[in-house]
Amino acid sequence: MVKQKRKGLERTAKESKKQKITPAEETPRASEARPGKEAASPVVQEASPELSPEERRVLERKLKKERKKEEKKRLREAGIATAQTAKVQTPPAKPSAAVLALEYLQGWAEKQESWRFQKTRQTWLLLHMYDEDKVPEQHFSTLLDYLEGLRGSARELTVQKAETLMQELDGTDPKARSLGKMQRLRQVLQLLS
């Protein structure tokens, strides 16, 4: 008998829920009503004495979702991008690795207190120090001073690479050699050997 009462209560609760939620035709559309929470509040307030707090919350969410869809549709039709897509399209420009490495070198030369060792910047400088386009002549003399203080495996690897590059350039056609690169290689080898 207890089970029968529960079933009876469940049926009446379900039936009352169906009656409480008004059909979509009767509810005012978000585009017709005023924008914001006020558009949905009359429907929710009408049903609020009959709805439980959870049911009311679910209904509010549904109405909010509908309003959001309508607004997106309106904006799409008007050709205006949403604020979220606008933020994604304009990331801030980052300085290039070359600029950062040369600033690092200048900071070292000026003995700024904010200067600190950065492995990635040093690696970039060591890889590109023979390229006159990436490390201009005005910075190369500073780079030589920086290389003087180079220690450990970085110093050994730099010497090995310089010797290897020198041998490769000696084996190539004299007309194809870059005089600037040869001169830089000699200076680095003289300094570190």
Curated annotation (Swiss-Prot):
Q: Name one GO biological process term.
A: negative regulation of cholesterol biosynthetic process
Q: Which GO terms describe its cellular component?
A: extracellular space
Question: GO MF annotations for this entry?
Answer: hormone activity
Q: What is any Pfam family matched here?
A: WKF
Q: Sum up the protein's function in the record's words.
A: Hormone secreted from the intestine in response to cholesterol, where it acts to inhibit cholesterol synthesis in the liver and VLDL secretion,leading to a reduction in circulating cholesterol levels. Acts through binding to its receptor, GPR146.
Q: Show the PANTHER family listed in the entry.
A: CHROMOSOME 7 OPEN READING FRAME 50
Name the record gives this protein: Cholesin
